[in-house]
Amino acid sequence: MFAFPVTLLLIGVLALIFASEMWLQVQYYGWAEAISPQILVDLGANYPPALLAGEYWRLLTSCFLHVSFLHLLMNSYALYLFGPMVERNFGRGKLIQTFLVTGMLGSLATNVLHRSDGGYISAGASGAIFGLFGVIFFAGKYHAKRLPKELQSWLNQNMLLLVGMSFAPQIDKWGHFGGLAAGLLLGWSYVSQHRGSAPPLTGEVKRSEDSHE
């Protein structure tokens, strides 16, 4: 894992920010499994009324906040799975770029496509996680003929799992799909930049059933 410092750094940043959320939660509202909506809004969650007031920075800051420890744990584990593959194959800069760009576009998709009265609150790195997987998936399909069958199967299984879980209750599916679409486009861009010189997608494959418990 220490061979992938940017992935480790991102996981550490998410953990530190959540620790700050929990500290504020305990200080002002008492212990709870989920962070208070007011704290999430105050710290920069995706909140349409605030965005309409010009607080566009929430499209980014919301990607670093999490609603509960389980929420953080799931996204951190997904980052542990997908981050090193992007970092190994495309570089540290591309990993940071992918995380930030797809996370923001996922947040934007939520605001554009979410059908509600606009009073919802959205937070989490899921859009960025889906973006990272989008890059991996596109690169894998581009190099499909040169990929081991195990890796091809891993990509397909995770795509089905990620899309399927997006329809669960209380899940921001538009943020997921917005991040995924942005990741696929970035994957196309990255592969195009290295066409003819890039090696096949490589990476340690984790069993899909271990990816989403």
What kind of feature is each model-predicted range?
Residues 1-212:
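A detector for small-residue-rich transmembrane helices and their helix-helix packing motifs
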